[in-house]
UniProtKB/Swiss-Prot annotation:
<keyword id="KW-0687">Ribonucleoprotein</keyword>
<dbReference type="GO" id="GO:0005763">
    <property type="term" value="C:mitochondrial small ribosomal subunit"/>
</dbReference>
<keyword id="KW-0934">Plastid</keyword>
<dbReference type="Pfam" id="PF00203">
    <property type="entry name" value="Ribosomal_S19"/>
</dbReference>
<keyword id="KW-0699">rRNA-binding</keyword>
<keyword id="KW-0694">RNA-binding</keyword>
<dbReference type="GO" id="GO:0006412">
    <property type="term" value="P:translation"/>
</dbReference>
<dbReference type="InterPro" id="IPR023575">
    <property type="entry name" value="Ribosomal_uS19_SF"/>
</dbReference>
<comment type="similarity">
    <text>Belongs to the universal ribosomal protein uS19 family.</text>
</comment>
<keyword id="KW-0689">Ribosomal protein</keyword>
<protein>
    <recommendedName>
        <fullName>Small ribosomal subunit protein uS19c</fullName>
    </recommendedName>
</protein>
<dbReference type="InterPro" id="IPR002222">
    <property type="entry name" value="Ribosomal_uS19"/>
</dbReference>
<dbReference type="InterPro" id="IPR005732">
    <property type="entry name" value="Ribosomal_uS19_bac-type"/>
</dbReference>
<dbReference type="GO" id="GO:0003735">
    <property type="term" value="F:structural constituent of ribosome"/>
</dbReference>
<dbReference type="GO" id="GO:0019843">
    <property type="term" value="F:rRNA binding"/>
</dbReference>
<comment type="function">
    <text>Protein S19 forms a complex with S13 that binds strongly to the 16S ribosomal RNA.</text>
</comment>
<dbReference type="GO" id="GO:0009507">
    <property type="term" value="C:chloroplast"/>
</dbReference>
Length: 93
């Protein structure tokens, strides 16, 4: 189920305050956050936000196409290790 439009998007207060302060100063710094559930809003365009994936912070550069998505969508939490190959099983018999 999607979020109600009358509530507006969820953005962590500390993250929104940092974005607004940087926009007022016209600075571009990497912002470190653990808030994967925050929605990307137009004020974030052009900033780099380092999103925590459980082990490290991954830098995500915000573009216009990312608006209304969550920050956690762009920082994968799982690593894929390839499946085992079946080449050596016959030689063991």
């Amino acid at each position: 189920m999607t979020r109600s439009l009358k509530k507006g998007p969820f953005v962590a207060d500390h993250l929104l305050n940092k974005i607004e302060n940087l926009n007022a100063k016209e600075e571009k710094k990497v912002i470190i956050t653990w808030s994967r559930a925050s929605t990307i809003v137009p004020a974030m365009i052009g900033h780099t936000i380092a999103v925590h994936n459980g082990r490290e912070h991954l830098p995500v550069f915000i573009t216009e196409l990312m608006i209304r998505h969550k920050l956690g969508e762009f920082a994968s939490t799982r690593t894929f290790r390839s499946h085992l190959k079946k080449s050596d099983k016959k030689s063991r018999r």
